[in-house]
A protein has these predicted regions:
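Active-site beta3 strand of CheY-like receiver
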Residues: 60-67
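Short hydrophobic/Thr-rich beta-strand motif most characteristic of the beta2 strand and flanking loop
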Residues: 40-47, 55
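C-terminal output helix
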Residues: 122-131
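The feature encodes the CheY-like receiver
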Residues: 29, 72-73, 81, 90, ...
Length: 140
């Protein structure tokens, strides 16, 4: 009898399927991490923009990035601008998310280089759809 364990159930290898997630709200960080891990991704979490910045300086190997727009120390758009200025990080697609209702935040995020924008609160299905748009291929 051959049984498949969790490590081999996804079509793609989990190696190379890493996403950095930064949000200063611990509940949102846990929620997004849980959803992405169920999709087969390895998640590297950061509690704020400064922590995400430090991670990105030493580790450029991410499939995608998901950042809150408004965070202490370094904002989401500031992180995206940093990524777009670094050759080794330029190709990582970025999703921005926020609970703020100010339309300027989404336009600032896109101007910085974000690919998709997800308003909070969101459903699991909405996050999955935006992730597929972000990465540009189906996760089936």
């Amino acid at each position: 009898m051959v049984s498949k364990d969790d490590k081999t159930t996804t079509k793609d290898s989990k190696e190379g399927r890493r996403i950095i997630v930064a949000d200063d709200d611990p509940a949102i960080l846990r929620l997004v991490t849980t959803i992405l891990e169920k999709e087969g991704y390895t998640v590297v979490g950061a509690r704020d923009g400064r922590e995400a910045y430090k991670i990105l300086q030493t580790d450029p190997n991410f499939t995608a990035a998901v950042f809150d727009v408004v965070m202490p120390h370094v904002s989401g758009p500031e992180l995206v601008r940093f990524m777009k200025s670094e050759k080794r990080l330029q190709s990582i697609p970025v999703m921005m998310m926020t609970a703020e209702q100010d339309p300027k935040l989404s336009s600032d995020s896109f101007a910085a280089g974000a690919v998709v924008f997800l308003p909070k609160p969101f459903t699991t299905a909405q996050l999955q759809t935006m992730l597929q748009m972000l990465i540009g291929k189906s996760v089936s």
